[in-house]
Amino acid sequence: MAQHPLVQRLLDVKFDTKRFVAIATHGPKNFPDAEGRKFFADHFDVTIQASILYMVVVFGTKWFMRNRQPFQLTIPLNIWNFILAAFSIAGAVKMTPEFFGTIANKGIVASYCKVFDFTKGENGYWVWLFMASKLFELVDTIFLVLRKRPLMFLHWYHHILTMIYAWYSHPLTPGFNRYGIYLNFVVHAFMYSYYFLRSMKIRVPGFIAQAITSLQIVQFIISCAVLAHLGYLMHFTNANCDFEPSVFKLAVFMDTTYLALFVNFFLQSYVLRGGKDKYKAVPKKKNN
């Protein structure tokens, strides 16, 4: 029996590992921007395949672990958090000159309306690494379910949609990605550093977690403000900005839902219930 073309497309996994490694290890000098963007365009189906596999593995593992003791995974978790913290710090540092240089030299509006050299050279290399990293960050959830930590809708929804958006948007190179990527690098630099310290059993003041969540909310407020102004420019002026309507619509959907979910998380965690913790074990009575 012949399969539906869409089903066949989703089952036909094609990931050019050699090509991926060549771009990832190319380095910033003479970075092949066009080839980097084409890689994501050619492999967009991988994000849908990965999302389906991710859901099956995550919720399958959660079910499998329901009557079992949690894994500690101390050393792997320490290594994982350290890698993501170091990567995020490096990305934030490397992209800072281009971000603020564009604002200073071109103006605030132009910095999210136009691409300029955002995907060129060293900055382009780190943009590409950022987009690629969203596939690998799915592993974050595996640690949660194996250690029987709370798995919120916000967590897995955020991971899936960010990955899909990253791989879809980069080939089209919208100017406003400058803000989303740079701000995300900065926030993750703090967030994964915090996770690393906690996984190392290093005492961290309780207000730090609340501050990081607040920083995430500020990130999405800025992103939504940028998109709102671009929407105004697109509909009420003759501004010619560098983005496709489809990417803009997806970005609006993504950032507005993120803002709503993170505000709700903040209220539930720090205002109404007194705090949640990624590293707090699930009470045994909830494991049955």
From Swiss-Prot:
Transmembrane segments: 39-59, 73-93, 126-146, 150-170, 180-197, 217-237, 247-267
Cellular localization per UniProt: Membrane
GO process annotations (BP): fatty acid elongation, monounsaturated fatty acid; fatty acid elongation, polyunsaturated fatty acid; fatty acid elongation, saturated fatty acid; sphingolipid biosynthetic process; unsaturated fatty acid biosynthetic process; very long-chain fatty acid biosynthetic process
Major localization class: membrane
The enzyme's E.C. designation: 2.3.1.-
Keywords associated with the record: Fatty acid biosynthesis, Fatty acid metabolism, Lipid biosynthesis, Lipid metabolism, Membrane, Transferase, Transmembrane, Transmembrane helix
Gene Ontology CC annotations of this record: endoplasmic reticulum membrane
Broad EC category: transferase
Substrates-to-products reaction catalysed: (6Z,9Z,12Z)-octadecatrienoyl-CoA + malonyl-CoA + H(+) = (8Z,11Z,14Z)-3-oxoeicosatrienoyl-CoA + CO2 + CoA; (6Z,9Z,12Z,15Z)-octadecatetraenoyl-CoA + malonyl-CoA + H(+) = (8Z,11Z,14Z,17Z)-3-oxoicosatetraenoyl-CoA + CO2 + CoA; (9Z)-hexadecenoyl-CoA + malonyl-CoA + H(+) = 3-oxo-(11Z)-octadecenoyl-CoA + CO2 + CoA
One of the record's GO molecular function terms: fatty acid elongase activity
Lipid bilayer topology: Multi-pass membrane protein
Pathway info: Lipid metabolism; fatty acid biosynthesis
Domain of life: Eukaryota
Family: Belongs to the ELO family.
Function summary: Catalyzes the first and rate-limiting reaction of the four reactions that constitute the long-chain fatty acids elongation cycle. Uses malonyl-CoA to add 2 carbons per cycle to the chain of long-chain fatty acids. Condensing enzyme that catalyzes the elongation of monounsaturated (MUFA) and polyunsaturated (PUFA) fatty acids that are involved in multiple biological processes as precursors of membrane lipids and lipid mediators.
The protein, known as: Long chain fatty acid elongase 1
Originating gene: elo-1
